Amino acid sequence: MRVTILAAAAALAAIAAPAATAGASGSYFLSICQFSHRAADDPIVLPRSPGFSHDHSFVGNLSTNAFSTLGSLRKAGTSCTPQADTSAYWAPTLYADGRPVAPVKAAIYYRRLTTAPVRPFPAGLRMVAGNAHAYKPQSPAITYWDCGLLKTTFYGPNGGGSIPVTPAVSSTVPVCPPKAEGQLHVNFPDCWDGRRLDSFDHRSHMAYARDGRCPAGHPVAVPALSLVYAYPARAVDAARTIGLSSGGQYTGHADFINAWNQPALTKLVRGCLDNGSVSPTLDPTQTYNHC
């Protein structure tokens, strides 16, 4: 079922931060990435098996395919700013009336959600977030859809203006205002077991923090990575059928392989996340680094 989101004015073109609630924002940094390519490949779940996955839309590393390794990724270029981020990011391809819809851009936020100091992701770390086989709404703490950052016009005795409005969260692709962007958000776990770069199910080596603390089995706090894919509303609003390559609209998920220039990532984590406060939310008007 499509969900209609109403706004009194046009939406901002910029990608909105992950949904905000009351409270002060802490520090974070981000990569802004352009769409790179599509392929029925998944180097985490189906390595060395080209064409055997459902279709994915890749951003970041320009070379990501079924055979990708840390070494191959580090030799390739990136669609991200900063250029030091040569990591691989991907999510299922969105289809409107059977036609693939490429994201216009993606934002990858790196936040601190724990009270403990944050360590950089180890080189080559692999993660999966969200459920590709979901048949009902997933927790919005992990994945959700919205219409990005909206502006509402107001008028008063001293003139008018506009204020940002936090968008409504939906479990399915929403119908957005014409200039808005439908956005898929996926939040990755932020606690690591400190030993493995991957695990048999690509999840067991990672965990989500609870109340700002990492569980005993995953004691190492790492950046809380939030991936946001933005799609043009005009490409999906008139469609009769909308789905993801992994199945229905509930199947939002994403994958990540850390291939950052490691010294650059370490500098950002230490200089930004570990010098700031815990940031459970983001300022919805801020779409750039906030350190």
Question: Locations of the language-model features?
Answer:
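Primary mode marks residue(s) on the alpha4-beta5-alpha5 output face of response regulator receiver
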Residues: S25-S53, S57-V186, D193-C291
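Secretory targeting and sorting signals
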Residues: M1-A24
